[in-house]
């Protein structure tokens, strides 16, 4: 990766983290269209989730509904998504390099 690409990636990560920090303060407390429609169609869901969310409703359970909990939750989520994307990219980059070494296209 050349220096220009590194600067581009660094700027993208910084922008993503800035958005993660500001998002809890800009988000509407009202439910979105899908959520409000689901509440109208099925007001009392009787099922339990198969898996509990680690960051339910973009908060950390230990911090409650505070904006700080939302900020920490968004930053953790952003870092996790970036790490997963990097890992998937590394796997495919490794496969491409292995295919080139073996003479396959």
UniProtKB/Swiss-Prot annotation:
Keywords: Cell membrane, Membrane, Transmembrane, Transmembrane helix. Residues 32-53 are annotated as: Disordered. GO terms for cellular component: plasma membrane. It is found in: Cell membrane. The chain crosses the membrane at residues 8-28, 72-92. It is a multi-pass membrane protein. The keyword Cell membrane applies. To M.jannaschii MJ1570. This is Uncharacterized protein MTH_1706. It comes from Methanothermobacter thermautotrophicus (strain ATCC 29096 / DSM 1053 / JCM 10044 / NBRC 100330 / Delta H) (Methanobacterium thermoautotrophicum).
């Amino acid at each position: 990766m050349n220096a220009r690409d590194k600067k581009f990636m660094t700027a993208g990560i910084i922008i993503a983290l800035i958005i993660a920090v500001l998002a809890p303060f800009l988000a509407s407390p009202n439910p979105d269209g899908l959520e409000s429609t689901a509440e109208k169609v099925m007001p009392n869901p009787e099922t339990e989730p198969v898996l509990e969310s680690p960051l339910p409703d973009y908060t950390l359970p230990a911090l409650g509904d505070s904006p700080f909990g939302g900020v920490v939750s968004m930053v953790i989520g952003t870092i996790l998504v970036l790490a997963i994307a990097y890992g998937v990219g590394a796997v495919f980059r490794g496969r491409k390099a292995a295919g080139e070494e073996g003479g396959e296209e």
